[in-house]
Amino acid sequence: MGHEGGTEWVRLIVGLVIILAFSQLNALFLVWLERKVAGRIQLRPGPMEVGPHGLLQTIMDGIKLVGKELITPRSVDRKLFILAPVLVFMPVLVGFLVLPFGPGLILRDMNVGILLIFSFSTFTVLAILAGGWASNNKYALLGAIRSVGQNVAYEIPLLLTVMSVVLMVNSMRFSEIVAAQGRVWFIFLQPVAGLLYLICATAETNRAPFDIPEAESELVAGFHTEYTGMRFGLFFLAEYTNMFIVTAVATSLFFGGWHGPFGFDFGLPGVVWFLIKTYVLIFVIMWVRWTFPRIRFDQLMNFSWKFLIPVSLVNLVVTAVVLKLIDLN
C-alpha cells in the first residue's frame, strides 16, 4: 500500500513538472503563432529576424522581459499588487490536471473534471479584479471591473452549453465524454452548443472582438497598465494558457478529444489528434481577433443577456426533452 502511494506521488510530481514546462513552451509558441497569423492577415510576413521564420523571436522577447525592471508604484497596495499576477496564472494550470490528452494520458481522471475547470476559472477573474484595484489606477480598475462584468455575462451561457453535453453522457468525467464520441463527434449532434461555446470561450479569454477589459484605445492596457517585467509577463502567460485550456475543453466536449474523424485515426496517436484539433481551434480564435473590430461594452452585454443566454437555455431544454423522449421509446 505504501509503495503504491509513493508511486502515485512520484507520478503526480512528474506530471506537475511536465505541465509547468509545457505551459511555458506552449505560451511561447502561441505568441509566435499569433504574430504569424496577424502578419498573414495584414499581408506581411511577421517576425523573421531571429531564427528560421522568426521561431526564436518569442524566446528573445521572453529573455528581454525577464531582464526588465519590476517597478512598483508608490501608491499601490504593495502585497496585493505583487500577488495578483501569480494568482492569475496559478488557477489556469489546474485545468491541465483533468484534460484528456489521450487514452490514459490524464493526470487526474476526476468524476467532476468539468466542474473543477470552471470553478477555478472564477479565481482568475478575482485575481484580475485584485490586480486592478491594487494598482490604484483608474484605467486598471475600470478594466478589472469590465472583466468581472464580462465574465459573469458569458459564464452563464458557457455553462449552459456544457451542461447540454453533460446531459447526453450523464457524466462530468472528461474520459467518458470523449469515449462517447468514438464514432460521431458531439459537434454534429450539438452544433448550436458548440458554436455558442466557442463564442463564450472567446469572450472568457478577453480576446477580440471581446477584449473590452484591455481596450488600448480607451484604457491604455486595462487591468495590467501598471505592471512591468515578468509580472506583466505572467498576465500574458495566463491569457495564452487559458486560451489553450478553453480550446482543449472544446476539443474534448465537441470534437471527439483524442479520436480521429468518424472513428478513423489514420495511424496517428490520440495525443496528436487532440493537439491538432486544439491548435486548429486556437487558430480560429486568432483569426477572429485579427479580422473583426472590437465591439462596445454595452453591445457585449446585450449580446450575452439578450441572445446567448436565451439561446443556450433553449438548447439545454430541447436536449433534455429529446433525451427523455428517446428514453421513453
Swiss-Prot record:
Subcellular location(s) per record: Cell inner membrane
Molecular function terms from GO: NADH dehydrogenase activity; oxidoreductase activity, acting on NAD(P)H, quinone or similar compound as acceptor; quinone binding
Q: What catalytic reaction does the record list?
A: a quinone + NADH + 5 H(+)(in) = a quinol + NAD(+) + 4 H(+)(out)
**Top-tier EC class:** translocase
- Tagged with keyword Transcription regulation: no
Gene Ontology CC annotations of this record? plasma membrane
Q: Name one GO biological process term.
A: aerobic respiration
Keywords of this protein's UniProt record, alphabetized?
Answer: Cell inner membrane, Cell membrane, Membrane, NAD, Quinone, Translocase, Transmembrane, Transmembrane helix, Ubiquinone
**Which InterPro entries does this chain map to?**
NADH_UbQ_OxRdtase_su1/FPO, NADH_UbQ_OxRdtase_su1_CS
Record flagged with keyword Lipoprotein: no
Pfam families under this entry? NADHdh
Q: What is the recorded membrane topology of this protein? A: Multi-pass membrane protein
Kindly provide the name given to this protein in its UniProt entry: NADH-quinone oxidoreductase subunit H 1
